[in-house]
């Protein structure tokens, strides 16, 4: 299935699940959608926090197409699920934002680690959440983001359990793709990130960690949602964690070496 066909399936509500493992050669995007009055500060926030917030594209005010991301994209309908934030609180999860769209909304598309998972799989590195049919586990750390205007919050990380040799190889592979979070930010003890219990992720689903495996953590594109919470905007929208926008951008084009 091509990214265009995948987006059409989402648009017509034929697909509603997590997007990990789909259209493996193409980049997936996290989304943050907010009023234009706050767009400059959010852009500064992304530039100040490039590890969790690598930008793939930014729309014009009121533009729900964002053509730099792909053909015939409609941001309002082409994501399997959206989180709606009101005054910094998660208000609802919806399957379309057509009725919520505002003429001053600006779309920020942020790189996603699902994009490099295909590269890991091709090298024989197993992905537990894919094997178990679950959403990747994501954790809110105690590491503060660099602030920009009203945007702050804490770093969110995704976690994949790997054997030592696979963890080393994963560092080598993902370092080539800073546009989709790059190399891990931590390997090992979750307490060093302020994570109390790996069995209780704030976002996504817990996965099995087997004997001899290390938890490997990547900066995560759910991080902007902690910034939206901290900003307490009257209305802001993001993708539901694990439910991404499929783009026409090839993963190969994002490699820096």
Swiss-Prot record:
Q: Which NCBIfam families does the record cross-reference, listed alphabetically?
A: PRK05463.1 (NF003969)
Q: Superkingdom of this entry's organism? A: Bacteria
Any idea which UniProt keywords this protein has? Answer: Lyase
Q: EC top class, in one word? A: lyase
This protein is called: Putative hydro-lyase Bphy_2364
Signal peptide segment:
none
Family that this chain belongs to: Belongs to the D-glutamate cyclase family.
One GO MF term, please? lyase activity
Enzyme nomenclature, EC number: 4.2.1.-
Specify the species. Answer: Paraburkholderia phymatum (strain DSM 17167 / CIP 108236 / LMG 21445 / STM815)
Please give the Pfam families that the UniProt record associates with this protein: D-Glu_cyclase
């Amino acid at each position: 299935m091509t990214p265009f066909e995948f987006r059409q399936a989402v648009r017509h509500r034929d697909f509603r699940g997590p997007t990990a493992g789909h259209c493996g050669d193409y980049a997936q995007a996290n989304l943050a959608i907010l009023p234009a009055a706050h767009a400059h500060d959010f852009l500064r926030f992304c530039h100040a926090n490039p590890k969790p917030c690598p930008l793939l594209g930014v729309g014009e005010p009121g533009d729900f197409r964002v053509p730099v991301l792909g053909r015939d994209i409609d941001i309002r309908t082409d994501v399997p699920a959206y989180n709606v934030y009101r005054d910094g609180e998660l208000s609802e999860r919806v399957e379309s934002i057509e009725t919520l769209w505002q003429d001053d909304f600006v779309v920020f598309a942020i790189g996603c680690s699902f994009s490099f998972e295909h590269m890991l799989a091709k090298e024989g590195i197993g992905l537990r959440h894919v094997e178990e049919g679950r959403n990747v586990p994501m954790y809110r750390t105690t590491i503060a983001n660099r602030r920009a205007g009203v945007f702050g919050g804490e770093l969110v990380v995704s976690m994949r359990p790997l054997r030592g040799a696979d963890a080393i190889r994963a560092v080598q592979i993902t370092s080539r793709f800073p546009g989709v979070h790059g190399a891990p930010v931590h390997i090992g003890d979750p307490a060093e990130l302020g994570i109390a219990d790996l069995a209780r992720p704030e976002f996504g689903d817990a996965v099995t960690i087997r004997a001899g495996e290390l938890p490997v953590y990547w900066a995560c594109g759910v991080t902007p949602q902690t910034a939206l919470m901290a900003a307490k905007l009257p209305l802001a929208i993001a993708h539901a964690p694990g439910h991404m926008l499929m783009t026409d951008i090839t993963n190969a084009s994002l490699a820096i070496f």
